[in-house]
Amino acid sequence: MVFNTGAALLDAIVLAVVSREKEGTYGYKITQDVRKAIDVSESTLYPVLRRLQKDECLEVYDRQFDGRNRRYYKVTERGMAQLNLYHEEWKNYSRKI
């Protein structure tokens, strides 16, 4: 990968991936979807999910799946506002190059 995958870029990609699912999505699927855009390990991604939860950009809930709990992540209003900010910043950046 040519670009540095700093915290803001990872946050933007994760928020974009999670925002596609209205009812939220689970960690493994988020990892698979993010990997379509950039090469990232689960050990890198889960701290991003925790940080976004702490920053109130994601809400977390558990749901039963095949007899066990699966943790789901859903974008909050604050998360959507942050994603929109990242999108605007990206448009401004790309116009300059």
Region roles according to the model:
Residues 75-80:
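Accessory beta->alpha helical hairpin/"wing" motif in late/C-terminal subdomains of nucleic-acid enzymes
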Residues 2-44:
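N-terminal helix-turn-helix DNA-binding core of bacterial DNA-binding proteins
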Residues 84-97:
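Amphipathic alpha-helical dimerization/coiled-coil segments
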Residues 46-51:
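Short, hydrophobic-biased segments on the C-terminal half of alpha helices
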Residues 65-67, 81-84:
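Short, structured secondary-structure boundary patches
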